[in-house]
Structures are given as structure tokens and as C-alpha cells.
Regions:
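Conserved active-site beta-strand-loop modules that form the wall/rim of enzyme catalytic pockets
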Residues: 223
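Acidic/His-rich structured neighborhood in mature extracellular/periplasmic domains
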Residues: 43-213, 217-220
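A short, ordered amphipathic alpha-helix with a cationic face
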Residues: 4-8, 41-42, 169-170
């Protein structure tokens, strides 16, 4: 797919969602189209369970194709590959859970728990958005004029590495984990004492899915300013690993916003064991205003 400018991306998303909404019957519109200014715009979760909206498995083939086009439009080539990986991990998890049932294979898009919602009217000049959300997956785009925002966005997986079945060894988001661990392993003893925020990994994500994250007065971890040149390059690569999931026009603008706000304020923290194979561990980036 050719790289789109921001106005081209906004236009492509607008055309796709208009096409999709035109194909919805009255009941589908009732379940899948909501006001932009309602609370649903900020209400989402990565946990399993039902969501408001249209389950992808209930869409017609034509409607499903448009929904998947939207999902691909929202991501870079690598981001789209990561999206498919997250879906494959979820499919593998369910395959293992359904071994006792008379089902040996599932369609990842039709059988897995993902829902589509449209927020607002893509025909109007007012802000509007669309979202595809399900277990461990959230992609949302908010369109204001010819500008596109790509948050909130979430990838996750459980298990992080598939341990049984035909997908044994498949890792979810391996580059994120490897970059964070590589950075941690380059730190000197005094640096590592700052970066190590806990000896055990938390049971869940610290910020959960809250629309406004309450951060401590002083960010935990080691700041960008306390890293040497090579470590800063690793830190930036780790940040870009997340930012560059988005389509380039959105990712590049996000990176400008981050660097303009100041990388010096960003901190890296690690919780849990560092050496691979010694237990669950993970890193995070933290900044009071981000």
C-alpha cells in the first residue's frame, strides 16, 4: 500500500466508513453507530468480554472486508503485521481452550471477540471516529478535518509466548520485549538501580485503560538524560517501536509531538527479572504529561 499523506489518510478513512455505514441495516446502525461526544469515545478495555458495537463475525463479507481495510489503513506495514500477530496469538489461545470441543480450527476474524463502532458522522464536517476493539486489541482513529489521531491504541497478548499446540514458540510483540531487555542490560549498576522499579512484574498494566492516567509526582525509572549515546539510541528505538505501529503520517506527527515536548522528561523503568527465561519481566516508558 502506498504511503498516504495525512489528508489522504483522512479522506480514505472517511470514504471507507461512509461505504460501510451505507451497507448497514437499521438494526446494525443502532448497534454500531454512536454519537462522537458520548462517553464511549473514551471508554474501552483490553480485557475479554462483550463490547458495544458490531461483532466482526456478524458482518457480511463485504462489510467485513471494509472493516479490515480500515484496520490496515490505521497501521504501518509493520503495525499491520503486528496486528495480525496479536490476532494469531488470540486464535492460538482459543484453539487450546477449545481442544475438548469438536472444533479444531477457527476463523480469526469471524470467531474471535472483536467489535466495530463508528462515533459521529463521517459525512459531516464535525469530528468523528471509528474503533475496532476486542481482547488485547484496540485500534481507533479520530478524524478532525484532514487530520487523523491514532490514540488510544493497544496491542497485548496472553500468553506472551505460545507454549503448546501448532503455534508453539510464537512470540507476541518480541521486538518490544527484546529492545527493552537490551537497554536494561546495557545499564551500569548505578543506572540499573534507577531503572529497576520492582523486582517482580505487576499482575496487570499500571495505567489500565483509564482515559486520564494518574502518574506519580516524580516519574519512576531512569530518565533519558541519564543515558549515554548508545543507550539513548536504544531508548528511542524502543519508543519508535510503539509509535511506528501507526501509519507513517500519524506516527511521524506523534514523534514530532513527543520530541517537541522533550525526551529529557521521559523515563524508562523495568519490573521483574532481567535475564530471559528467569520469569516475567517488562519495561515501560513514563512521563508526567504523556
Amino acid at each position: 500500500m502506498a504511503e498516504l499523506t495525512m489528508p489522504e489518510l483522512a479522506s480514505a478513512m472517511r470514504a471507507a466508513v461512509r461505504k460501510l455505514v451505507d451497507q448497514l441495516d437499521a438494526e446494525q446502525r443502532r448497534r454500531g453507530v454512536f454519537p462522537f461526544d458520548g462517553d464511549l469515545h473514551k471508554r474501552w478495555t483490553y480485557l475479554p468480554g462483550e463490547r458495544p458495537g458490531l461483532r466482526l463475525g456478524d458482518l457480511t463479507d463485504v462489510q467485513l472486508d471494509v472493516a479490515l481495510d480500515l484496520l490496515e489503513l490505521a497501521h504501518s506495514v509493520r503495525g499491520w503485521s503486528d496486528t495480525q500477530l496479536v490476532i494469531r496469538i488470540e486464535a492460538a489461545r482459543r484453539e487450546l481452550a477449545l481442544q475438548q470441543a469438536d472444533r479444531s480450527d477457527i476463523d480469526p476474524y469471524r470467531d474471535l471477540p472483536y467489535w466495530l463502532v463508528v462515533l459521529g458522522d463521517p459525512r459531516s464536517t464535525e469530528p468523528w471516529a471509528w474503533r475496532i476493539n476486542g481482547h488485547h486489541l484496540l485500534a481507533q482513529a479520530t478524524i478532525v478535518g484532514d487530520q487523523v489521531g491514532g490514540v488510544p491504541h493497544f496491542f497485548g497478548a496472553e500468553p506472551a509466548t505460545v507454549l503448546a499446540g501448532p503455534h508453539t514458540g510464537l512470540r507476541a510483540l518480541p521486538r518490544e520485549e527484546d529492545l527493552a531487555r537490551e537497554l536494561m542490560l546495557t545499564l551500569q549498576e548505578d543506572q540499573r538501580s534507577l531503572a529497576q522499579i520492582a523486582t517482580t512484574a505487576p499482575a496487570d498494566i499500571a495505567s489500565r485503560w483509564d482515559p486520564v492516567v494518574s502518574l506519580p509526582e516524580r516519574p519512576r525509572g531512569i530518565s533519558y538524560g541519564h543515558l549515554d549515546r548508545g543507550q539513548r539510541e536504544l531508548f528511542e528505538a524502543l519508543l519508535r517501536q510503539y509509535v511506528d505501529r501507526a501509519t507513517p503520517a500519524v506516527a511521524n506527527q506523534a514523534w514530532v509531538d513527543i520530541t517537541d515536548a522533550g525526551l529529557q522528561q521521559v523515563c524508562f523503568g523495568w519490573a521483574g527479572p532481567v535475564e530471559p527465561g528467569t520469569g516475567r519481566g517488562g519495561g515501560r516508558a513514563d512521563r508526567r504529561s504523556w
